[in-house]
């Protein structure tokens, strides 16, 4: 578990980070006992740290008794260079795509073996969306994730291919199939998905380059891609090139 600390005599800082690390995309709200177990800390220690973090606004506690990440963490996260620089520079281009398509638009980067969503502009309510700005999703089941995975170091690709998880009946979980898809992404310059993360949602994404380096992925989520794929790819490429020029200064 991400937040687990089992070393005797661990510092206060490491214990605080163990508590914060207990939260993830699938564990957004935790009871005290769940928080204690996932952090690998004694219940009394967890209770004391959680109470202090609630007082500081780092955690919040619902009426149900569950703890969630507080607004202060989100506010601090927005100050990170990867958030402020890329997100702000890309914003006009994301809004241009959104205005032209009225579809959900994503800007994302890779963090380890997951997609980190820097921005999400929500489109049609008829398309199911599970992403959120600041949230993380698997690389292998999202359009932006496949772009980032295709251009990730070999070690990252190997780690992802060795632990593919089925999310819907259409999620690609055969390593040889995903490897072939990633090769096409590198060759064609874009990635697509269909019902792989959420049923009823398809996506298309392209890389954002700073020079020769892929620094992010830009994507759109729509009900289906059969008619508009090339038009959406063309629009995304124009926007990605614009972001790349701005990043290059």
Provide a role label for each language-model segment:
Residues 9-13, 66, 70, 83, ...:
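Short, structured helix-loop boundary elements
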Residues 88-100, 184, 188, 242, ...:
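Amphipathic alpha-helical regulatory segments at dimerization interfaces
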Residues 107-112, 121:
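Short hydrophobic alpha-helical segments used for membrane anchoring or interfacial signaling
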Residues 59-60, 107-108, 208:
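A structural signal for short hydrophobic beta-strand segments in well-ordered beta-sheet cores
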Residues 170-244:
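Extended hydrophobic
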Residues 72-100, 126-129:
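Conserved segment of winged-helix/HTH DNA-binding domains
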Residues 125-197:
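Short, solvent-exposed recognition segments
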Residues 1-83, 230, 241-249:
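N-terminal helix-turn-helix
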């Amino acid at each position: 578990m991400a937040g687990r600390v089992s070393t005797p005599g661990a510092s206060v800082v490491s214990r605080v980070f163990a508590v914060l690390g207990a939260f993830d995309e699938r564990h957004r709200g935790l009871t005290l006992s769940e928080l204690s177990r996932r952090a690998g800390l004694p219940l009394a220690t967890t209770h004391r740290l959680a109470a202090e973090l609630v007082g500081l606004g780092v955690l919040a506690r619902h009426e149900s008794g569950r703890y969630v990440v507080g607004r202060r963490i989100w506010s601090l996260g927005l100050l990170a260079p990867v958030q402020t620089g890329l997100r702000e520079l890309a914003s006009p281009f994301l809004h241009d795509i959104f205005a032209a398509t009225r579809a959900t638009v994503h800007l994302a980067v890779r963090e380890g073996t997951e997609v980190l969503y820097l921005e999400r502009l929500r489109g049609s309510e008829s398309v199911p969306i599970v992403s959120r700005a600041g949230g993380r999703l698997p690389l292998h089941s999202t359009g932006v994730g496949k772009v980032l995975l295709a251009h990730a170091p070999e070690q990252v690709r190997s780690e992802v291919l060795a632990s593919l998880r089925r999310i819907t009946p259409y999620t690609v979980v055969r390593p040889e199939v995903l490897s072939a898809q990633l090769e096409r992404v590198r060759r064609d310059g874009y990635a697509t998905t269909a019902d792989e993360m959420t049923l009823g949602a398809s996506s298309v994404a392209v890389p954002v380059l700073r020079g020769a380096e892929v620094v992010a992925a830009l994507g759109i989520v729509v009900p289906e891609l059969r008619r508009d794929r090339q038009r959406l790819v063309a629009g995304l490429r124009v926007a990605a090139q614009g972001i790349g020029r701005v990043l290059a200064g």
